[in-house]
Structures are given as C-alpha cells and as structure tokens.
Regions:
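A conserved beta-turn-beta hairpin within the catalytic core of GNAT-like acetyltransferases
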Residues: 65-77, 87, 109, 182-187
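Conserved acetyl-CoA-binding loop-helix of GNAT-fold acetyltransferases
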Residues: 87-103, 122, 203, 210
Length: 250
C-alpha cells in the first residue's frame, strides 16, 4: 500500500534529492539541493514523500508565494516526481491530493505549477483529472537543461492554476463533469510526440515552436485552457474566454 506523508528529516529529504537523478537524469549542477527542501518545509511550503513498504518512490515540493496584485498567498508546486515503474499507479494524483488537503487546512485556495505542453499525458492529468486550467504560458522558463526527458529543447511551459476549493475542481475530483464553456480555440499535439522527440529533434523543435506561438497568441487574447481532449492521433488543448470559466473559488 502506498503511503503519502510529510518529510521531516534531512535524511528523508536527501532521498528526494537522489530521486531527481533517477527520474529526470539531472546533473549534480541542476539538482534542487536538500537545503531548499528543508527551507521549504520550514517557511510555509510543502515537502511530501510517497512510500511503498518504507521505500520512497515519489515526492513533491512546493514553496510559498504572494500573488500580485492583491497580495494573495498561494503555493507554487515546484517539483513532483514518481519513479518510472510507479507512474501508472496513481501516485502522482495521491501526492497532488495530499498537497490540496494540506493547503486547504491553512485556507490556501490556489496552487500553481508549470508543465511541458508537449507532455500530453501530463496535460490530460493536470486539466482533466485535477481540474487545473492554463491561464499563462512562459517561454524557456528554466533554460536548456541536461534532463534526458527534455531532449535539448527550450523549456517552454504552461502555467497550471489549481483553484483548490472551486466548483470546477471539486466536481472533477468527485468524478463528475464541470460546466464546459464554448470552445474558442484549440491547439493539437501529435500523439507520437514522444517518439518524435527521441528520433527527430528538428521536427520536435518545429512542433514546439508552433505550439508555443499559438499558446502565446491565444493567451494574449484573454483565453485560457479549460479542457484537454485525447484521441489516438493527438492531444488537444481547448481554450475558452477566461471570464466565462467557472474556476473561481466559492
């Protein structure tokens, strides 16, 4: 049985540091150091581990932030990783739900994180399983990294906004269907994107450029991603006007 719990000791947090190399293949230079995990746990952030019979098989870490304008406190979930052999076991969802539960216990209603728009499995999970929307997009957020999963591409990122106590999120987490405003625009990513990134870097870069250009255009017009459709051929981001979405807190 998988156990999710907060990490408290330096030794446990060192395990999370080691998992970064196993999961993403980061160099020592790019690892988030243990001292940041310790600091996050002490200044209002979150550090959770997922354990299978006492062995850490996943983790997540969030840091506190202030949203402007309005000085609204929120959490930025900077990192979540699960070992490859556990990625279809629901561990990522368990970690996110524990983050949500703990945040709501402190009356924090907003969590954000970033994800690669080409990672269509993650997109489906974030938008359709958790209920996050995408109101912002950032070009080359982290620069070029050494991760084997990034294939040398720029780190263009969707910004996921998860309004933890919204009707949308509660409906989706309960297995229901939220209100679906009319689609205004869409962006498709081919389902074979993982093979393309591994075998045809030039084509992968062209796809990324097209996707990023379209994201920047749509978001500049006040649109946000509120749904994600999957077919055998592609994953498709569905945009609606931001003011029409039922994602605000109750």
């Amino acid at each position: 049985m998988i156990e999710i719990r907060a990490l408290h000791t330096v030794e446990e947090m060192n395990e999370a540091v080691c998992l970064q190399q196993l999961i993403w293949g980061f160099t020592d230079y790019e690892l988030i150091p243990v001292r940041l995990f310790v600091t996050a746990s002490k200044v209002g952030g979150q550090v959770f581990g997922a354990f299978d019979q006492g062995r850490m098989i996943g983790f997540c870490m969030a840091i506190p932030g202030i949203k402007q304008p309005g000085n609204r406190s929120y959490l930025h979930s900077h990192m979540l990783g699960v070992m490859k052999e556990y990625r279809d076991a629901g561990v990522g969802r368990m970690l996110k739900l524990e983050q949500r539960k703990e945040a709501l216990s402190r009356s924090l209603g907003l969590m954000e994180w970033t994800f690669d728009p080409l990672e269509i499995k993650n997109a489906y999970f974030n938008i359709e399983r958790l209920g996050a929307i995408v109101p912002r997009y950032v070009l080359n957020q982290y620069g070029t990294t050494s991760s084997k999963l990034h294939y040398g591409l720029p780190t263009d990122r969707c910004v996921a906004a998860w309004l933890l106590d919204s009707a949308r999120v509660e409906t989706i987490l309960a297995g229901g269907q939220p209100e679906r405003p009319a689609s205004v625009a869409s962006i498709s990513v081919p389902s074979e994107i993982y093979e393309i990134k591994a075998n045809d870097p030039a084509r992968a870069r062209d796809i990324q450029q097209r996707v990023s250009d379209q994201f920047m255009e749509h978001i500049s017009k006040g649109l946000a991603v509120t749904a994600f459709h999957r077919t055998p051929e592609a994953g498709t981001y569905i945009f609606t006007a931001l003011h029409t979405t039922s994602w605000d807190s109750k």
